[in-house]
């Protein structure tokens, strides 16, 4: 009989299960902090594998983009149809300091705006902010019925639409190029630019449902930690940001 290893004896018992390893044991949680431009600064939490050896968790978190409903950031359901993108620029302990990365509309809101018997006007422009962020801004508007109009439809002539589109581009360039990214965010929340377009185009065409429907970040300047900390209020521990006002006050009539 040949002397050798008995394969039957070396085998383990059948039916034994491997010890279950919790995948979350190797991960750690981080708090996502929105800029102080928004009212609610606590966006949520995210996780990543713990730092091991040369692999640093902070490197994997920088550049992450989160999409958040503006209603959650502002604490108001009036903004539920708009989504804000926030990008992680710096990691401080367990806090992720984010910056504005873009804005978009929900698809159901956009579909609800498009109706029969009216003309759609769209315009977009690529513009640089005062702090060297290159953005592409998209605007949308619809024609509306004039006072005492009998006609059912509100279709506009193409020449009028070209005039309106030109005016929209001019206003967007002016409103974006003269402000920083943080100041622009404060304008986008109460839709100041949309109201400015409505006021300026009143003599050409009466418009309704005027919105900045999308803001896309194309290029950003060299990272500056000081400006990011200033955007987050230095300490970045406060849960509440500054309330953005629309700049319009309700007029109360003394007598009817």
Curated annotation (Swiss-Prot):
Residue(s) carrying N-acetylalanine: 2
Superkingdom, natural source: Eukaryota
Any single Gene Ontology cellular-component annotation: cytosolic small ribosomal subunit
Keywords associated with the record: Acetylation, Cytoplasm, Ribonucleoprotein, Ribosomal protein
MF terms (GO), sorted A to Z: structural constituent of ribosome
Family annotation (Pfam families): Ribosomal_S3Ae
GO biological process per UniProt: translation
Primary location recorded for the protein, binned into one broad class: cytoplasm
UniProt cross-references to SMART domains, sorted A to Z: Ribosomal_S3Ae
Cellular localization per UniProt: Cytoplasm
Entry annotated with the keyword DNA damage: no
Family per similarity comment: Belongs to the eukaryotic ribosomal protein eS1 family.
Quaternary structure note: Component of the small ribosomal subunit. Mature ribosomes consist of a small (40S) and a large (60S) subunit. The 40S subunit contains about 33 different proteins and 1 molecule of RNA (18S). The 60S subunit contains about 49 different proteins and 3 molecules of RNA (25S, 5.8S and 5S).
Name the UniProt record assigns to this protein: Small ribosomal subunit protein eS1B
The organism of origin for this protein: Clavispora lusitaniae (strain ATCC 42720) (Yeast)
Gene name tied to this protein: RPS1B
């Amino acid at each position: 009989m040949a002397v050798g290893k008995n394969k039957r004896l070396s085998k383990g018992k059948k039916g034994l299960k491997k010890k279950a390893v919790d995948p979350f044991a190797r991960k750690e949680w981080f708090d996502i902090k929105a800029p102080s431009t928004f009212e609610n600064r606590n966006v949520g939490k995210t996780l990543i594998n713990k730092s091991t050896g040369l692999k640093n968790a902070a490197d994997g978190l920088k550049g992450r983009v989160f999409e958040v409903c503006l209603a959650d950031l502002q604490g108001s359901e009036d903004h539920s149809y708009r989504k804000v993108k926030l990008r992680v620029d710096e990691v401080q302990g367990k806090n992720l300091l984010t910056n504005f990365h873009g804005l978009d509309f929900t698809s159901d809101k956009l579909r609800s705006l498009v109706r029969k018997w009216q003309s759609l006007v769209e315009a977009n422009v690529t513009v640089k902010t005062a702090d060297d962020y290159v953005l592409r801004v998209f605007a949308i508007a619809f024609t509306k019925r004039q006072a005492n109009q009998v006609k059912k439809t509100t279709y506009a002539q193409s020449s009028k639409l070209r005039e309106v589109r030109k005016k929209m581009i001019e206003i967007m360039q002016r409103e974006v190029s003269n402000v920083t990214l943080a100041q622009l965010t404060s304008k986008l929340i109460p839709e100041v630019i949309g109201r400015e377009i409505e006021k300026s185009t009143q003599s050409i065409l009466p418009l309704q449902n005027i919105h900045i429907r999308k803001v896309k970040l194309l290029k950003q300047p060299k990272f500056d930690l000081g400006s990011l900390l200033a955007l987050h209020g230095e300490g970045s521990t406060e849960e509440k940001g500054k309330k953005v006002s629309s700049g319009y006050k309700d007029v109360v009539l003394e007598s009817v």
